[in-house]
Regions:
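Sec-dependent signal peptide cleavage junction
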Residues: 17-27, 401-406
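Early extracytoplasmic/lumenal segment of secretory-pathway proteins
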Residues: 23-111
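Extracytoplasmic ligand-binding site segments that recognize negatively charged/polar headgroups
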Residues: 47-62, 83, 97-242
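Paired acidic/hydrophobic, glycine-rich loop segments that form the ligand-binding mouth/hinge
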Residues: 99-103, 230-231, 247-252, 267-268
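A ligand-binding cleft/hinge motif common to bilobed small-molecule-binding domains
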Residues: 109-111, 242-243, 248-265
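Periplasmic-binding protein-like
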Residues: 215-224, 262-286
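Mature extracytoplasmic/periplasmic domains
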Residues: 276, 280, 285-346
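Conserved C-terminal helix/tail region of periplasmic/extracytoplasmic solute-binding proteins
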Residues: 342-417
Length: 417
C-alpha cells in the first residue's frame, strides 16, 4: 500500500473530530477535490440503493456523505433504502428501475451473479480499492476473481438484550423460545436471517438443501410464534429496543452499538450455537445508466475521510485499512465490531431455486400462523367442518335421488294399470 501513513494518521486524528468543526472545503485535500471535479460528472445522476441507517447522513455533526459527493462532483445522487436483501432483489428483478450502485450482502451478490444481473467493475476508476482495501476483504468467496464488487462493511448477527428485563446474560438463541418473555421478543422480519436462528438451534448447515431440514426449522419458528408471539421487525428495531419495552432483539452487531449508545441498559452476545458472518459490498447492476458515476461513488466511499465518517456513524467494521489502523477511531479494538477472534459462525450462500421457493413459502406460513399449533387446530376445525358439510351434501343428494327413483317407479306402476 503506497501512502504516507504518518500523514494519513494525522489527518484521520483531526477528522475524528466532528466534521462540523471544519469548513466543508477543509475536509478534502486539493488533490481529492481536483480528482472528483475532473471526472466530468456535472449534471449527471447517480442512483444509489442501500440498506436503511447504513451511511453517514449528516446528523449530529457527522459528514453528509451524499452531499459531499454531490459537492465534489457536481452530480446529483438519488439515494433510496431497502429493508432486506430479498426486498432489494424483488425490486431489481421486477424491472422498470434504474440503479447505479447497490449494496447487497454476500449471498445475494452470488444470486445476482448467477442470474447475470451485475456488470464487472473497471477498477481503474476505483483507485482507492488498491490503496486502502484490506487483503482480507479482497477475493471474497462470492467474488473470488474480484471482478464485480468492493467490500463496504463486515458484520455479524448478535443477540441483543435489555439487562433490566433479563435475569441473567444469555448464552444461547434458545431464550427466544422462552415463554416467560412472551410479547417481549423482536425477531428478524426476513426469511434468511430468521431461519438461521432456528437452524443454529437444530445444528443445521445454514445452506442446507434438504427440504426436511427447512421444514424442521419452520416448525421450530412456528413453535416460537405460539410460545412467545415475537414481533417481526427490521429498521423498527432501533426505536423499539431503545424504548426499553422489549427483552430481546435479533439484529446486527453494528446496529447494536448504535442502540446501546441511546440505551445503556442494552447488551449483546454472540450465542454459543453460532452467528451469521456476513459481508456487504458495492456493486453496479446491469440496469445502470451511469456506470462512470457509479464507480466514482464507490471510490468516494473508500476515501479515508469518508470511510472513517461512515464507520463512526453506522458502527460497522470497515474494510478500509486507514480506518482500521487509526487508534483514535472510536471503535478501535471494540470487541463487538472488531473482535480479536471472530465468533463461531457461518456464511450464507445462494440457495437453489427450489429451496428458495420452499423457504419463502414456509416463511409466509410461519408468519401467518398456518404452521403454528393454533393454526393447525384451526385447519383441523375447518377440515372437519368441511367434511361434515360434505357428508350432509352427499346425504341430501342421495335422498333426492332415492325420492326421484321412487316417484319414477310409482309412475311406471300407474302406467301399467
Amino acid at each position: 500500500m503506497k501512502k504516507c501513513f504518518s500523514f494519513l494518521l494525522t489527518l484521520l486524528v483531526l477528522l475524528a473530530m466532528p466534521v462540523s468543526a471544519f469548513a466543508a472545503d477543509d475536509v478534502f485535500t486539493p488533490a481529492q477535490k481536483a480528482y472528483y471535479k475532473n471526472l466530468g460528472l456535472q449534471g449527471t445522476t447517480v442512483n444509489v440503493y442501500n440498506w436503511g441507517e447504513y451511511i453517514s447522513e449528516g446528523q449530529e455533526g457527522a459528514m453528509n456523505t451524499v452531499k459531499e459527493f454531490e459537492r465534489l462532483t457536481g452530480a446529483k445522487v438519488n439515494y433510496t433504502n431497502f429493508e432486506s436483501n430479498e426486498n432489494m432483489y424483488s425490486k431489481l428483478s421486477g424491472g422498470g428501475v434504474s440503479y447505479d450502485v447497490i449494496i447487497p450482502s454476500d449471498y445475494m451478490i452470488q444470486r445476482l451473479l448467477e442470474e447475470d444481473m451485475l456488470l464487472p467493475l473497471d477498477y481503474g476508476n476505483i483507485p482507492n480499492y488498491d490503496k486502502y482495501i484490506a487483503p482480507d476483504c479482497k477475493g471474497l468467496y462470492f467474488d473470488p476473481q474480484q471482478k464485480y464488487t468492493v467490500c463496504y462493511n463486515i458484520g455479524t448477527t448478535v443477540l441483543i438484550y435489555n439487562k433490566k428485563l433479563v435475569k441473567e446474560a444469555p448464552k444461547s438463541w434458545s431464550v427466544l423460545w422462552d415463554e416467560q418473555y412472551r410479547d417481549k421478543v423482536l425477531m428478524f422480519n426476513n426469511s434468511r436471517d430468521a431461519f438461521a436462528l432456528a437452524q443454529f438451534m437444530l445444528g443445521q448447515d445454514l445452506n442446507t438443501t434438504s427440504e426436511e431440514d427447512w421444514n424442521a426449522a419452520a416448525e421450530l419458528l412456528a413453535k416460537q410464534k405460539d410460545a412467545v408471539r415475537p414481533v417481526y421487525v427490521m429498521d423498527e428495531v432501533f426505536n423499539l429496543m431503545e424504548s426499553g419495552e422489549y427483552a430481546f432483539a435479533t439484529y446486527y452487531a453494528g446496529d447494536y452499538i448504535l442502540m446501546q449508545d441511546n440505551n445503556p441498559d442494552l447488551a449483546c452476545c454472540f450465542p454459543e450455537e453460532g452467528v451469521n458472518l456476513f459481508y456487504d459490498a458495492m456493486c453496479v447492476p446491469k440496469c445502470t445508466q451511469n456506470k462512470k458515476g457509479a464507480e466514482a461513488f464507490i471510490n468516494f466511499m473508500q476515501e479515508p475521510q469518508v470511510a472513517l465518517a461512515n464507520q463512526e456513524y453506522i458502527y460497522y467494521a470497515s474494510p478500509n485499512l486507514a480506518v482500521r489502523q487509526n487508534e483514535d477511531n472510536s471503535l478501535y479494538g471494540n470487541p463487538v465490531v472488531y473482535p480479536k477472534v471472530w465468533p463461531k459462525g457461518q456464511y450464507f450462500y445462494n440457495l437453489p431455486q427450489n429451496i428458495l421457493e420452499l423457504q419463502n413459502d414456509l416463511w409466509a406460513r410461519v408468519k401467518s400462523g398456518q404452521l403454528s399449533a393454533d393454526g393447525k387446530a384451526q385447519d383441523r376445525r375447518i377440515y372437519w367442518a368441511s367434511g361434515a358439510v360434505g357428508a350432509a351434501a352427499v346425504l341430501a343428494v342421495s335422498a333426492r335421488l332415492i325420492h326421484k327413483a321412487r316417484k319414477n317407479k310409482e309412475q311406471n306402476l300407474r302406467d301399467l294399470y
